[in-house]
Regions:
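N-terminal cap/lid segment of alpha/beta-hydrolase-fold proteins
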Residues: 24-54
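Glycine/threonine-rich phosphate-binding loop and adjacent beta-strand/alpha-helix elements that clamp
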Residues: 26-31, 282, 326-516
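Gly/Ser-rich "nucleophile elbow"/oxyanion-hole loop immediately N-terminal to the catalytic nucleophile
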Residues: 48-55, 101-109, 116-142
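Short substrate-entry loop that stabilizes the transition state in hydrolases
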Residues: 51-56, 61-88, 93-99, 266-269, ...
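Accessory cap/linker subdomain of secreted extracellular hydrolases
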Residues: 82, 111, 131, 150-252, ...
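Short beta-strand/loop motif that positions the catalytic acidic residue
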Residues: 253, 259-261
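Short alpha-helix in the alpha/beta-hydrolase fold that links the catalytic acid
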Residues: 269-279
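Catalytic histidine neighborhood in serine/cysteine hydrolases
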Residues: 280-298
């Protein structure tokens, strides 16, 4: 991390303790021409100099997949302005009114677009700047989190980032252990394409009419996924290049990083946040992880979502500490996580190392994999998150545990499956179930934190059983009074694809559950 003490001390003195600004900010909407002549439309919000004198540090705030840069000074952008930050939003290539094609936060394309925007900021006298190096932070969720990682890995001018509900490895996000995450994959394709095609066609568009679109590669990948039912090696390689797990091997993220992740997020689950946390920590850079209730899947109505605005306050502290350089700011414990009762907890070790004991659960059974959905889903099927399987489902093994009300589960379960039987293959899904023991009818069962782990198994043979070990999905859960935890292993899912082909699966399962 760069040491710019004189400039940072002066900046801190100018901005610390300011009251919220009351005047409307200045908003500049324009575009730059990126490295390959693609127009990138941006919005630059500047605080009222009567309230906060220039120069200002700047925060780049991206947008989600299929969206466009905010043109409103409300919400957290307004909070940043009142605290003496300029804010820049932009339409990522292929979306909004920007030109080009969407390449899924490719460092060589979208990453270079952001570097061009930083060039623009570096040339402005009203942006805090030392030797052409502006004070830059980045925030935003999902696609806007991915671009923070892709930019900061290659552009040393980024001082701090706050990626929210984003990925470490898109191969795992979209095709966990070889299984297509059907609900999210198809939904993202449709939503993103609508955003790409509709945003820039107006005659009065900032950079002129633009026909946004996906890259040809991405269109082919979607078609192959639908046709094959799994991701081929070329698809996996393409997504690796757009993941910290890929480019970060030689170009690591080594800037102060506050990672925000939703415990019920079934697209980018907490395992990805743990991987990003470990990656940044390995570079010796400051890193913090906050696990909250929500994400791409909303916090369930029977959970307590906790203190409103808690992560926003932590974000502001992170920016003040590492962008403004106010060393007296306390950013708190390296890991904070919320449980379903709304309580925030602090830890000095990684999320996957918090557990103080493990409960081991064993079960054995024979399952049917029909190549189609066999689960009887309770009520309306959720297409993006895990739902319980009926105990009488022939494709499901339900295993009781000794975990009852008042117990706390925190961390990443460990799964070992010994698979025999007969058939070309099967998809196996493992989830923790919360059951109210006061009820005979299992329909109110709920999957703990709405998460399930998936595994693709090929060539099931009765003479050569396979032993497969993999991680479950991380959870942070306090079991309600009168409830008990079960484990289900199923051959079907309401949110992911089933194996295309029938099989009989002889299963011996061992699941280790992390406890406090």
């Amino acid at each position: 991390m760069r040491k710019r003490l004189i400039a940072l001390v002066a900046l801190a003195a100018a901005t610390f303790g300011l009251l919220p600004a009351h005047a409307a900010p200045t908003v500049i909407r324009s575009f730059i021409t990126s490295f390959d002549d693609t127009p990138i439309v941006y919005n630059l919000f500047l605080p009222d100099p009567a309230d906060t004198p220039a120069p200002w540090p700047v925060v780049l705030n991206g947008h989600g997949w299929g969206g466009s840069g905010s043109q409103s000074a409300g919400g957290f952008i307004g909070t940043l302005l009142s605290e003496g930050y300029a804010v820049l939003t932009w339409d990522a290539r292929g979306f909004g009114q920007s030109g080009g094609e969407a390449w899924v936060d490719d460092p060589a394309r979208e990453g270079r677009d952001v570097s061009a925007l930083i060039d623009l900021l570096a040339a402005r006298s009203d942006i805090a700047n030392v030797g052409g190096d502006p004070l830059v932070g980045m925030i935003g969720g999902s696609y806007a989190g991915g671009i923070q990682l892709a930019t900061s890995a290659f552009d040393p001018r980024v001082d701090a980032i706050v990626p929210n509900v984003t990925w470490n490895d898109l191969r795992y996000s979209l095709f966990p252990n070889g299984v297509v995450k059907l609900g999210f994959d198809t939904g993202l394709c449709a939503t993103g394409l609508a955003g790409a095609l509709g945003g820039g066609l107006s005659a009065d568009a900032t950079a002129g009419p633009q026909t946004g679109s996906y890259s040809t590669d991405l269109n082919l990948i979607e078609a192959k996924g639908v046709a094959l039912g799994y991701a081929d090696p070329g698809t996996l390689s393409w997504f690796r290049e757009r993941s910290v797990a890929g480019y970060g091997v030689e170009n690591p993220v080594a800037v102060p990083t506050l990672i925000l992740q939703g415990i019920t997020d079934a697209l980018f689950n907490v395992n990805e946040a743990v991987a990003n946390f470990d990656h940044v920590a390995a570079q010796g850079a400051p890193v913090k992880l906050m696990v909250f209730c929500g994400g791409h899947v909303a916090c369930p109505s029977n959970y307590n979502a906790g203190v409103a605005g808690y992560t926003n306050a932590a974000t502001m502290k992170w920016l003040d500490r590492y962008v403004k350089g106010i060393e007296s700011v306390d950013t708190g414990a390296s890991v904070e996580y919320a449980t379903n009762d709304g309580v925030w907890h602090q830890a000095a070790v990684g999320f996957d190392k918090i557990a103080t004991s493990w409960t081991t659960v064993n079960g054995r059974g024979t399952l049917v994999s029909s190549g189609a959905k066999t689960s009887v889903i309770n009520g309306m099927a959720g297409v993006t998150y895990a739902t319980p399987s009926h105990p009488l489902d022939p494709g499901t093994l339900t295993i009781p545990t000794a975990i009852t009300g008042g117990s706390t589960i925190v961390g990443i379960p460990k799964i070992t499956l010994r698979v025999g039987g007969a058939g070309p293959g099967a998809h196996l899904f493992v989830k923790l179930i919360d059951r109210d023991e006061n009820l005979v009818d299992p329909r109110p069962d709920q999957v703990v934190d709405l998460q399930e782990a998936a595994m693709r198994v090929e060539l099931i043979d009765p003479l050569f059983p396979q032993t497969i070990r993999f991680d479950g999905v991380g959870v942070s859960y306090v079991v309600p009074a009168g409830h008990r935890i079960l484990v289900q292993v199923s051959t079907s899912s309401g949110a992911m694809s089933e194996y295309r082909g029938a099989a009989i699966v002889d299963l011996d399962a061992t699941i280790r559950i992390p406890m406090l």
